[in-house]
Amino acid sequence: MGASASSPATAVNASNASDGQPASPPSGCPMHKGQRKGCPVTAATSDLTSESKAHTVPAHQDRAYDYVECPVTGARAKDKESLDPSNLMPPPNQTPSPDQPFTLSTSREESSIPRADSEKKWVYPSEQMFWNAMLRKGWKWKDDDISQKDMYNIIRIHNQNNEQAWKEILKWEALHAHECPCGPSLVRFGGKAREYSPRARIRSWMGYELPFDRHDWIINRCGTEVRYVIDYYDGGEVNKEYQFTILDVRPAFDSFSAVWDRMKVAWWRWTS
């Protein structure tokens, strides 16, 4: 495989996807009340946000905080509060699939990743949501194919990998701390597993393996959207922190600013 370049620092272990918008936090829970204060662009962008509702919230983030446990009390939103008021049924993506061999948790974990145009953060999928997503992609469960414990581990790996991806992005964004002191937020993301980046193809021509996945993350840098490309490479066994992949994270060549960032970091690496 070979070493991969990641942020202005070094390549870091991590992997795949995230989730997004919430409803209200569990009653009495002190979390999610902090706001990103001191950002000079908050007031400046509020008009634009109200005018265009620029960043549409994904459906899987709707009422997401109904399923997030309070880190202080361990309390979760009451079951009744987690039901669709129109039919008193849980949201479809939290409903067990027909012939599902075992029950799966519907609890969701709040990420550390700020959501654009919101004081809230992205919320990761539950075990049940992940299972249903795999079914929608054509996967079918077979005897002893995946266990209840496996699904728990899959979610832990998924969440940890996204946290590491965001840390890598923050290292790049540190180059722009002067223009965006409040830090970036995540607008949207998407998987492009078979759309190999030019960098990944060049590595392949040199004899290294292709990444097993690719994501593009669009972040909001205080009013400016910036695209990051993330290539995921197999890093061996899963460690105790649920990391097993090596990430190659970098801003896409979409602007002169991104090209300049890449050139600066390449020079630093070459001369360090």
Curated annotation (Swiss-Prot):
It is found in: Mitochondrion inner membrane; Membrane. Transmembrane segments: none annotated. One of its GO terms (molecular function) is holocytochrome-c synthase activity. Signal peptide: none annotated. Keywords: Heme, Iron, Lipoprotein, Lyase, Membrane, Metal-binding, Mitochondrion, Mitochondrion inner membrane, Myristate, Repeat. It catalyses: holo-[cytochrome c] = apo-[cytochrome c] + heme b. Its EC number is 4.4.1.17. Residues 1-62, 76-116 are annotated as: Disordered. GO terms for cellular component: cytosol; mitochondrial inner membrane; mitochondrion. InterPro entries: Holocyt_c/c1_synthase (IPR000511). It comes from the Eukaryota. A lipid is attached at G2 (N-myristoyl glycine). Residues 88-99 have a biased composition (Pro residues). Coiled coil: none annotated. HRM repeats lie at residues 28-33, 38-43. It is a lipid-anchor. Residues 50-62, 107-116 have a biased composition (Basic and acidic residues). Belongs to the cytochrome c-type heme lyase family. Lyase that catalyzes the covalent linking of the heme group to the cytochrome C apoprotein to produce the mature functional cytochrome. This is Holocytochrome c-type synthase. It comes from Mus musculus (Mouse).
